[in-house]
């Protein structure tokens, strides 16, 4: 029961926090609030963005993915997720990572040791820069400030840049994204 209650609170907060959530069997009902369409709208926005991402990636031959400096699990996991999207589209993709932090190291080593992933899954910023051409796209995950990215120089080299981030934007933004 505690888990159901905790989930209901999270759902109410995700929909604006101004309503009650009641689970009756398998059915979930929402009472009160002015944000009842938020969940549907959010799903529609996510679907539209996913479709746009797919269309953009289909026009490129190579995909470079990078997160922020001093990478954490959030950044690393996001990069792996985008890599899997690229793999599903049969696109060549690599994750840019210069310094592996102690929190990321165990996960990265599992990918390094896996025969399911290519040897060039992880590249340094310098290695990635050498691969950039007109058919390269750069996906920046978990960061929206150029100075915080793993390899800011790539932002100058790549013409097609996509930013996927959940943080608030500051005055410092990635140009041409």
Where in this protein do the model-derived segments appear?
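Catalytic/regulatory signature loops of cyclic-dinucleotide turnover enzymes
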Residues: 3-29
